[in-house]
Amino acid sequence: MADNFNFELVSPERLLLSEQVIDVVIPASEGEMTVMAHHAPTMTTIKPGVVKVHSASGKKQDYVVFGGFADILPTGCTLLAESAIPVEDLNQDELTRRINAAKAELEDAEHHEHKSRLEHFIMELTHLSGSIQKD
């Protein structure tokens, strides 16, 4: 049986989740990363994507995050999201609004680095939109 560890998902608005979990899959900037108890200490950036939580009670929950940071320790993981919402609460119109806002910002961007970051962000949001569309 796998050991449990504490996982916290925090957005600027509120603490979305704080509980004992078996594992968490996070959309790290380097790729999807599964975090379990006794994980090596790691700090990573989070790209827009889905966080998959497998709680110690057996319940599985998915959250959409729009970037942030994860602080991973052997005893726990804290994900500080720029914005986060349970997948079932995600409105496709809201995701489309975020994509359009990023495109508008891209049109006004003057520096190459800023344009590059926005293009990457738009690509990630578009991929996210396609991967979570509801039937």
Curated annotation (Swiss-Prot):
InterPro entries: ATP_synth_F1_dsu/esu (IPR001469), ATP_synth_F1_dsu/esu_N (IPR020546), ATPsynth_dsu/esu_N (IPR036771). The keyword Oxidoreductase does not apply. Keywords: ATP synthesis, Cell inner membrane, Cell membrane, CF(1), Hydrogen ion transport, Ion transport, Membrane, Transport. It is found in: Cell inner membrane. It is a peripheral membrane protein. Belongs to the ATPase epsilon chain family. PANTHER family: ATP SYNTHASE DELTA/EPSILON CHAIN, ATP SYNTHASE EPSILON CHAIN, CHLOROPLASTIC. This is ATP synthase epsilon chain. It comes from Rhizobium rhizogenes (strain K84 / ATCC BAA-868). The gene is atpC.
